[in-house]
Amino acid sequence: MSEQQTCVIDNGSGVVKAGFSGEDAPRAVYPSIVGRPKNVSALIGVDSASEYLGDEAQQKRGVLKIFYPIEHGIVKDWDDMEKIWNHTFYVELRVSPDEHPVLLTEAPLNPKVNREKMTQIMFETFNVPALYVAIQAVLSLYSAGRTTGIVCDAGDGVTHTVPIYEGFSIPHAVSRIQLAGRDLTTFMAKLLTERGYSFTSSAELEIVRDIKEKLCFVALDYEAALKQSHDSSTFEKNYELPDGKIITIGSERFRCPEYLFKPLEMNGKELDSIQDLTYKSIQECDVDVRRDLYQTIILSGGSTSIEGIGERLLKEIENRAPKSINVKVIASPDRRFAVWRGGSTLTSLSTFASMWITKEDYDENGASIVHRKCI
């Protein structure tokens, strides 16, 4: 590895993806969590520590209280976030951050004060030689080989629709809802409770998340699927719990992700659906660019990996778009890593060299330099 190889870190609400510029996939993918013992005696005799990070916190989740430093895409706890970055550099990537330029990702509409805080921590705590902060959706677009399009990015904590024209996001047309993967997991737990299964603790919710990721799909025609599930056992699947018990799941498999398309009807939430969000963002843009956006709708983020979501979104947008437009939804197979891959690609370009915020830039201008260099 060359001394100056860039570290690319995609900070998600649920999962951190980290690796090196120019590579096809992140080397480290782990939960963006910090775990602290519920009571100290619970961990006596184990290699007890006051806190655990990432995979280790996940493994010991039964006796830990789990904290997420990033909520709905925005960093809320900087002390814990610093610990996650420290873990990323020294444990996961095994590098010294003062020897590598770093690209960090951020949610669209990230508060200015947060961008400055990220910049300050990277230069002052980790002594990085250079930094760039990139909007997640723009990187997803690059990873799809486009510079114009609209990205529908649904992760664990937040869903955004971000129109991008010639590589620049259009901030006034960005839309967001606090409905994403974690909400789908909680909703699935609610549906399973109605079936007579109880999942309430943070450890049990991890089981529900696994059920959601392995068994859920989006119905192209929800009403027809619902009728079919009442008339037959077509959709029923078994799932084995960690204790060996088998549970059966049926219509919950498609009722859970329907929440993204009908938040009010499914769970009483007065939020825009993902099709409304996408349509609204496009309509907020100049009439001259709308056709390009309709023809390049890019899915990004782990929550868009649910089977059938691309076909359903296409159907919903076609119902709203002008009939003369050929709507296209692009759903790459490994889109949960689209943001990271875009960062890896971007930092590999020779033209990117002039875009870094260097240590000298930071020393001269302070953290506010991020607003000028990282647009």
From Swiss-Prot:
It catalyses: ATP + H2O = ADP + phosphate + H(+). GO terms for molecular function: ATP binding; hydrolase activity. PROSITE patterns: ACTINS_1 (PS00406), ACTINS_2 (PS00432), ACTINS_ACT_LIKE (PS01132). GO terms for cellular component: cytoplasm; cytoskeleton. Its EC number is 3.6.4.-. It is found in: Cytoplasm, Cytoskeleton. It is an enzyme of class 3 (hydrolase). It comes from the Eukaryota. InterPro entries: Actin, Actin/actin-like_CS, Actin_CS, ATPase_NBD. Its main location: cytoplasm. Pfam families: Actin (PF00022). Actins are highly conserved proteins that are involved in various types of cell motility and are ubiquitously expressed in all eukaryotic cells. Belongs to the actin family. PANTHER family: ACTIN (PTHR11937). This is Actin. It comes from Sterkiella cavicola (Ciliate).
